[in-house]
């Protein structure tokens, strides 16, 4: 069963949290997808973004949909990013001019249909952090293709993530304050997060985890 989905901007700590849940809770992690066809499409996309953007995003959406179905048939599954996260990047592509409005409508029609027939996780975790925090973590892990991206791109991405989250979240939600909480380096923060996850899986509504406190957030 798909227990948990972890969302957040690039550098928020999604993959790190999934790895922690695998190690500490015995969950099965589902990570970013890659295969030969995806690599071939990406290569063409970087050579001609406007030509290959829709092809790339539809292929990734299809792969994510299959991944969600597979996760739902797996005991204690946790996913690194969801179709909502994919939509964030598609909206960015449209904003940057690589996806035409009519192409976006095509993508959105597929997205809506697949979302409606996809299982809802028991808990959605959204790691919310500032651009400053995300950039510090991006620089720390040292991926050249991320470091060379202009700050304005990451600012837009954070904004799109916040907007998409407010639009699509439903069910049980845990928002982790990624600026205050460091569950990677700080053991007490990690314990705090794991305890909050255990509690929120069985709690209804939206909850926010700040440093030292878990509070209920009214919609």
Give the residues covered by each predicted segment:
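Conserved substrate/cofactor phosphate-moiety recognition/catalytic segment
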Residues: 23-63
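Post-Walker A alpha-helix
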Residues: 17-18
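Conserved lysine of the Walker
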Residues: 14
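P-loop (Walker A) phosphate-binding loop of NTP-binding proteins
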Residues: 9
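Hydrophobic anchor at the beta1->P-loop junction of P-loop NTPases
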Residues: 6
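A glycine- and Lys/Arg-enriched "phosphate-lid" helix/loop adjacent to the NTP-binding pocket
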Residues: 89-160
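NTP-dependent small-molecule kinase module
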Residues: 136-149, 153-219
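A basic- and aromatic-enriched beta-loop-alpha substructure that forms the phosphate/nucleotide-
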Residues: 64-102, 125
